[in-house]
Amino acid sequence: MCPLRSLFLMATLVFLNHLDHLSLARSLPTTTAGPGMFQCLSHSQNLLRAVSDTLQKARQTLEFYSCTSEEIDHEDITKDKTSTVEACLPLELATNESCLASRETSLITHGSCLASGKTSFMTTLCLSSIYEDLKMYHMEFQAMNAKLLMDPKRQIFLDQNMLVAIAELMQALNVSGETVPQKPSLEEPDFYKTKVKLCILLHAFRIRAVTIDRMMSYLSSS
């Protein structure tokens, strides 16, 4: 049977992947970072602040582009590609066959989060899945920013603080990770659609950033 604390964590992660209420996530208990995970926890907190600030600015700047959580069509670009919620199950849940992650993830081996040398396989799997999530979002945001820079109106660009925060957490997770390639665009940019897409991605990424931060906090306390 799955322990109560682990079930609570699982319910929290699933909840955060479907709802866009940061205040609810903040009401969850915050844990103290252990030495091995402190750097990644710090980076995840920086990322959460950066994406929240970027989303707030986008909602203000793009107020006529249906940029609120209630107006957008929610989309998860990691769907069917990564499985972070399942990969980040606590060990006592992961040993239950019904709780195992169902997708394959390339394992990271050289991240500073793994510096202790005692990191379990399940923790490595969780951090690897988080790294893959960040890589996908980083590539999407870079491609989107390239289009926004071509907009004659120069209305909005992505906050470099957010892109740096993503890159720093990726570096901490996998110091030998490959450089994230630019995603080429073969079509003429539609700036209206690009700005709507920006809102969709920022909402989705904030939810993921909350999930990552909660997970780092949990791992730090384990």
UniProtKB/Swiss-Prot annotation:
Pfam families: IL12. One of its GO terms (biological process) is immune response. The keyword Magnesium does not apply. Keywords: Cytokine, Disulfide bond, Glycoprotein, Growth factor, Secreted, Signal. Residues 1-25 form the signal peptide. Belongs to the IL-6 superfamily. This is Interleukin-12 subunit alpha. The gene is IL12A.
